[in-house]
């Protein structure tokens, strides 16, 4: 998946699917998908790429991470994955959280408060993301493995998820329509080790894998 924007500060971008054929040549798959980014655009994240010049992603900066990233679990409000989705899926309920408390050992990790423990996340973490929300943003989503080493302050809880409205920016995730996200998830083949490549078009030449 390749997400490109016009500049670092742009909150809108396009996602194009790419797939290698048997000869190793890369081909576009389908039409480009409109997506929204963080309201502050993008900054280099921590992923499979080497460091490069440009703004850096930090906790709470409202930037989506730029770079090359592995993909984690798909998730959603349903108990089981939608038909045709092959990536590992995790159903989220009111006890599921993603921790963005930089002082916690659980930083940048999905955590579940098990029953019968009181469902009081504020007693465990100073800041957290509810994975079962009152809106449809996380009705369907995909974890982006930004900052997999959980470096405090480097950014957390980065997902591909359903947007609140067309062109509505996020707090640092990449969002699109539910229909487009479902198409994307059904296309992903975990056996192919898919990745997310995300950067302003002018920064793509600077991308180098570790």
What residue ranges belong to the model's regions?
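Residues that recognize and position ribonucleotide moieties
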Residues: 174
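Conserved "landmark" site that anchors the functional core of diverse proteins
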Residues: 177
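Cell wall/extracellular polymer interaction/catalysis modules
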Residues: 1-171, 180-210
